Amino acid sequence: MTMNIGVIGCGLMGADHIRTLTTAVSGARVAAVNDADEGRAAGAAAEAEGARVHSDPFGLIDDAEVDAVVVASADETHEEFALACVRAGKPVLCEKPLATTSEACLRVVEAEMRGGRPLVQVGFMRRFDPSYLEMKRVLDSGRIGRALMLHSVHRNAGYPPALPDSALITGTGVHDIDIARWLLGQEIVTATAHTPRRSGLARPDFQDTRFLVLETENGVLVDVEIFVNAGYGYDVRGELVGELGSISLHPPATLTTRYEGLEGRPVARDFRPRFQDAYRNELQAWVTAGASGEVRGATAWDGYASAAVAEACLHSVATGSTAPVEIAPQPALYAPLAA
């Protein structure tokens, strides 16, 4: 059975999702697209081999020939499109953030609760990355004992000039927040944000570095280094320290060259080469799960919980002190984190 998918937003992420769904995901067909830029939508439709172009995103959601929806539009539109999908009873893969505030995320959670079943998967693709999956497998096996600390490095080669520096946490660091919750199987209860020296590449009103220290309910400390002007490339690394050993996460294997007395390997320019397998696995899992009425990735609740932690980090930035994470009780509709 083929799932007919509509894609809202045909920019960088949306175009990549359309390409992956069309060429690398089984059981899926891109049937309809929408974008605020009609020319871009037409180009995406052509790449998807004849998908229809909808001028109205809500018309795409309500289209009887669309079984499920990918939301890859501007962040501020995610909530309304996710809510519309829930009302229509259609599975939706919503790029992060689920909504721009934790309060708005909670509205999506409440809509799912009224409907009685989860329909929303949030695009935290690291959960599907082979290296992170192996890290979790080793931790869950007990080989390194209980987790004590998690170190995370997140560096971007550059950052869109229009974004505020709060996006370092809500748009960049939120990936590290979600993966920490998922790896450790624990909620984060406090957040402390430090402001390191700003790089000379940053514009005057932009703080391009942050350092977060998060504490989980069982006392595991998580530190997250964020730097979004690392001109050499995109760099995501990490180390999980346990009682009996540690697990280090490095960039995937690439060709190493030796030439004129030097040895080196290429560094990805952005997140897409580094996480191409994760995105493909995420989309395949979403399509497979959607066909059976399940959600296998990050849920709307995970989107809400990560947003709540991000807001605590921003509160710490503003006050200079440790901030508690204020989170509502988890509804029974959602499976608890697996420690």
Curated annotation (Swiss-Prot):
Q: What top-level class of enzyme does the UniProt entry assign? A: oxidoreductase
Q: What is the lineage of its organism?
A: Bacteria, Bacillati, Actinomycetota, Actinomycetes, Pseudonocardiales
List all membrane-crossing ranges: none
Q: Which family does it belong to?
A: Belongs to the Gfo/Idh/MocA family.
Q: Listed GO molecular functions? A: inositol 2-dehydrogenase (NAD+) activity; nucleotide binding
Name under which the protein is recorded: Inositol 2-dehydrogenase 2
Question: Is Transport tagged as a keyword?
Answer: no
Listed under catalytic activity are: myo-inositol + NAD(+) = scyllo-inosose + NADH + H(+)
Q: Tell me, what is an example of a GO biological process annotation in this record?
A: inositol catabolic process
Annotated Gene3D superfamilies: Dihydrodipicolinate Reductase, domain 2, NAD(P)-binding Rossmann-like Domain
Keywords tagged on the record = NAD, Oxidoreductase
